[in-house]
């Protein structure tokens, strides 16, 4: 198989915890780093022709990969990271770092992207989740995207076709994968943009446990409430299972403090959901995605 995909960076049985923000995750059968669209389509069409499962991880930020890892091809877009500016429009490849993309907007005195200046992850992942913070979200500036269909074809999707909602986009169900996207910004003042980004980054550092590995915001915001507040009222701040605990700094975050596992994360999430519902009557809904397989007995014996 590797011979047919010669020239493409493919790593066999690669531990995914080396690449995830949570620092958990078992091995990928084949971890693939395409350098361009041609390599990407080669991999996807090969996988489809040979009935090999494939998945795109983006930058693996708002995500938990189970300890058993992922079968088939796991495609990471780190090398698809070009960002260009044309007038008031920014075009970014899906693997571009979201924070770095907001810095490009600032450099060109373009406003509208400030809300995302501290959101970790990739541009593609941000579109997938309609990422947002501090009153802004991707849907507000999204123009269009080139996407790869599950069949391996490339098409363009408009903002209307994306059907954005709160932490939702149409591609969560369709299986289409963002390759690149265009964002419509407005001319602004460099100093004002810089000041706003500095303010938002200060708030993030003040309120969020950025010094620890985490999957970001674990739960969606319940209507009329804040997940972190509900978790705090349930007296779960600092609650720990294995190496993962509810952050003392922000109860909406779960941090990997001591060689935690995906199993620790899953058990802690389930405990928080159950306890908060018992305490408040409100059932929290996960924002973080959980993918992959549970660790098998053979894998445990080898580890």
Curated annotation (Swiss-Prot):
The active site is at 167, 217 (proton donor), 287. Belongs to the MurB family. The keyword Cell division applies. Keywords: Cell cycle, Cell division, Cell shape, Cell wall biogenesis/degradation, Cytoplasm, FAD, Flavoprotein, NADP, Oxidoreductase, Peptidoglycan synthesis. PANTHER family: UDP-N-ACETYLENOLPYRUVOYLGLUCOSAMINE REDUCTASE. Its EC number is 1.3.1.98. This is UDP-N-acetylenolpyruvoylglucosamine reductase. InterPro entries: FAD-bd_PCMH, FAD-bd_PCMH-like_sf, FAD-bd_PCMH_sub1, FAD-bd_PCMH_sub2, MurB, MurB_C, MurB_C_sf, Oxid_FAD_bind_N. Cell wall formation. The lineage of its organism: Bacteria, Bacillati, Bacillota, Bacilli, Lactobacillales.
């Amino acid at each position: 198989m590797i011979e047919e995909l010669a020239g493409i960076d493919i790593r066999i049985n690669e531990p995914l915890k080396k690449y995830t923000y949570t620092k958990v995750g078992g091995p990928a059968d084949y971890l693939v780093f395409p350098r361009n669209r041609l390599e990407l389509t080669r991999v996807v069409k090969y996988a489809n022709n040979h009935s090999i499962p494939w998945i795109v991880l983006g930058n693996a930020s708002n995500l938990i990969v189970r300890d058993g890892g992922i079968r088939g091809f796991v495609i990471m877009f780190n090398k698809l990271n070009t960002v260009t500016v044309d007038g008031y429009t920014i075009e970014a490849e899906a693997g571009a770092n979201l924070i770095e993309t907001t810095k490009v907007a600032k450099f060109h005195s373009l406003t509208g992207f400030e809300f995302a200046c501290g959101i970790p992850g990739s541009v593609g992942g941000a579109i997938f989740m309609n990422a947002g913070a501090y009153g802004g979200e991707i849907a507000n500036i999204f123009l269009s995207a080139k996407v790869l269909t599950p069949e391996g074809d490339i098409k363009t999707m408009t903002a209307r076709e994306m059907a954005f909602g709160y932490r939702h986009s149409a591609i969560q169900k369709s299986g289409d994968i963002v390759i690149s996207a265009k964002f419509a910004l407005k001319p602004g003042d460099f100093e004002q943009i810089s000041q706003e980004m500095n303010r938002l980054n200060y708030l993030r550092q003040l309120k969020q446990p950025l010094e620890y590995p985490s999957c970001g915001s674990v739960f969606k915001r319940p209507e009329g409430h804040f997940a972190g507040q509900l978790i705090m009222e349930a007296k779960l701040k600092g609650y720990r299972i294995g190496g993962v605990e509810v952050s003392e700094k922000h109860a909406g975050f779960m941090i990997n403090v001591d060689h935690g596992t995906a199993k620790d994360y899953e058990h802690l999430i389930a405990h928080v959901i159950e306890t908060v519902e018992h305490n408040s009557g409100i059932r929290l809904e996960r924002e973080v995605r959980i993918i992959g397989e549970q660790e098998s007995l053979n894998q445990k014996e080898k580890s």
